[in-house]
Amino acid sequence: MNIYMTDEGKLLTEEQLKLVEAILVYTATEEKIEANSELSVTFVTNDEIQQINREWRGKDQATDVISFAMDELGEDEIDFELLEDEPVVLGDLIISVERCREQAAEYGNHFERELGFLAVHGFLHLLGYDHIEKADEDIMTKRQEEILHHFELYRGKL
């Protein structure tokens, strides 16, 4: 899987970026995602994610992660999955590094654990997981924890 990460504000260290990439590659492998799939991940500030949230979701507040799935076709859009040998574009993840730091402190987690959680959580949304219904939430939560535990990222381990 090809992952394109953007951190223009230099909000993360090289090690943290590599951790996110490793977590996403592992998740893609575990979820049996095609090798020619593509995903973009952008790391932003609270102000930047608030602007995106306002423009695209109509919510004028900062949030931790936003997922934009590419499989939701609009009118006159091409279904790229029908094009042989073309990469499967899964979508975009936008992660607020500031909100990640705030939540890590609030929940008593290492920053890297919260960062990994947000990456996995957003990615699983792109893959069709959801948490609106309790049963779906339980499935998604279990999957997230399995993936994070593989990287020894546990809750409340400061």
UniProtKB/Swiss-Prot annotation:
The protein's required cofactors: Zn(2+)
Gene Ontology MF term list: metalloendopeptidase activity; RNA endonuclease activity; zinc ion binding
Location (main, coarse): cytoplasm
Keywords: Cytoplasm, Endonuclease, Hydrolase, Metal-binding, Nuclease, Ribosome biogenesis, rRNA processing, Zinc
Gene from which the chain derives: ybeY
Domain of life: Bacteria
Entry function: Single strand-specific metallo-endoribonuclease involved in late-stage 70S ribosome quality control and in maturation of the 3' terminus of the 16S rRNA.
Species name: Exiguobacterium sibiricum (strain DSM 17290 / CCUG 55495 / CIP 109462 / JCM 13490 / 255-15)
Enzyme class of the recorded protein, top EC level: hydrolase
UniProt key word Coiled coil: no
Name the UniProt record assigns to this protein: Endoribonuclease YbeY
One of the GO biological process terms: rRNA processing
Keyword Metal-binding attributed: yes
